[in-house]
Amino acid sequence: PVGKYVVIRLPMIFGINAPRTLEIDTAIKKDVSIEVFPNTIINVNSDVRLSQQIHYLINHKKTGIYHLGSTDLISHFDFIRTLIERRHNKSGIYKQVYTSNTMRYLATLPKENKLPHHLQPSYTDILDDLSLR
């Protein structure tokens, strides 16, 4: 029925102790290469911010389709490189993977049903959430 549902579209989700993040941490410690996609443009979210956003949707009885990613875009390679620099204060070893000759966009950006400003993180906010310092 109309008005009784919420569809949440998610980008790549990171968490301070999420498997994806811990896999990157392990690769850094073992000096193993990390696959990155330089021509893939993404937006991201963190597990903490996602839970805040869902909490808001439930408490305010919102309905409709929501895109819960960062408000800005970054290349996958730049995001992973910055994440590693912030978490480990060093650069990693990267295996750059090109899946096509053109830029690919894997992003969930809202056109309608926007959340309040304090629940719309940028990718730098997500990087701050994942920092170990």
Predicted regions and their residues:
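Short, amphipathic alpha-helical "lid/cap" segments that border enzyme active or binding sites
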Residues: D25, D47-H55, Q120-S131
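Short, low-complexity, polar/charged sequence segments that are solvent-exposed and flexible
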Residues: D25-K29, Q53-Y56, E85-H88, E112-L115
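Mid/C-terminal beta-alpha module of Rossmann-like enzyme folds, strongest
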Residues: Q53-Y105
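Conserved C-terminal active-site "lid" loop/helix of NAD(P)H-dependent oxidoreductases
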Residues: S75-R81, Y94-R133
